[in-house]
């Protein structure tokens, strides 16, 4: 199996299966000299780990991280950082009934056809358990980005099934199991999930993740566009079926006068582009939404086939998330952090000596997430000259 490495300069190679002895990764390209401890990484792992509420899988994994290399006397050395997370609560017998059949909506069938063998225990390599090491690696990236550039990456659940979750305050996100930025809606979300869990069914979710403080200039203009690599990273997360950056699909119904983010000396007047133009960061917040599909492992009977191609009825028992989106927020944050870290290093390597005399435009003239965009009360009035004749293509 190839394709287990993410990134070009900040590279993360992961390994391990859901019911194997351990999961792990090797992080190559971390700059030397940054203070780093297991506690720095554990904070984000604790946000993602299973068994934290009745609304997620009851598999009890401490997800304790071990740093095996790349850190000496509390600081990164610039050599590969190896991280290990041991599996401690596997219950493989729960999967004995599906060892010869394929779960609808799961990777079981395509793994079998591609490799001629599959680890049916918890989905093996296709399990979302693999994302634990992404979160661990990204904790390193988050710390470096914040220390070096002041970049802050955070996310929240924006929709649970049919329930839209309005944004109210970042402070609320860490105070409930849904990563909801609206504390008032949490009781309704709990009631919704209690009914869903009793029914044996599952549901999807939408997660929004925002990166603040990203400087102008990160990203490449053609194949390695920043937004393209963000979409690539987000789509690599298990169960993600859609990615929006900025206005996303809403831009279809917008007009040019509405979608194009006007610029004044005081800042951008909107952020429909989601902080990226031409594949390069603008200095505005980078805003990403992802769609997470309903969990395919459900207790309700579903039609499928067995290894011989015969009809079969599949009911999946065991410990599963009725909504994998509930724990997806730190994973989405992680993938955005990994992309930004990689591009930060790439930009530094190629463009460190570039000096532009044009003043940098502030990313915002008004309020941020959850508030209406637009000029602030102190925004100076600017008169714009008539547009010049367009250049020939």
Swiss-Prot record:
GO terms for molecular function: chorismate synthase activity; FMN binding. NADP(+) binds at residues 48, 54. Its cofactor is FMNH2. GO terms for cellular component: cytosol. It is an enzyme of class 4 (lyase). Reduced FMN (FMNH(2)). PROSITE patterns: CHORISMATE_SYNTHASE_1, CHORISMATE_SYNTHASE_2, CHORISMATE_SYNTHASE_3. It catalyses: 5-O-(1-carboxyvinyl)-3-phosphoshikimate = chorismate + phosphate. Pathway: Metabolic intermediate biosynthesis; chorismate biosynthesis; chorismate from D-erythrose 4-phosphate and phosphoenolpyruvate: step 7/7. SUPFAM superfamilies: Chorismate synthase, AroC. Its EC number is 4.2.3.5. Disulfide bonds: none annotated. Keywords: Amino-acid biosynthesis, Aromatic amino acid biosynthesis, FAD, Flavoprotein, FMN, Lyase, NADP. One of its GO terms (biological process) is chorismate biosynthetic process. FMN binds at residues 125-127, 238-239, 278, 293-297, 319. Residues 355-393 are annotated as: Disordered. Pfam families: Chorismate_synt. NCBIfam families: aroC (TIGR00033), PRK05382.1 (NF003793). This reaction introduces a second double bond into the aromatic ring system. HAMAP family: Chorismate_synth (MF_00300). Belongs to the chorismate synthase family. Homotetramer. PANTHER family: CHORISMATE SYNTHASE (PTHR21085:SF0). This is Chorismate synthase. It comes from Nitrosospira multiformis (strain ATCC 25196 / NCIMB 11849 / C 71). The lineage of its organism: Bacteria, Pseudomonadati, Pseudomonadota, Betaproteobacteria, Nitrosomonadales.
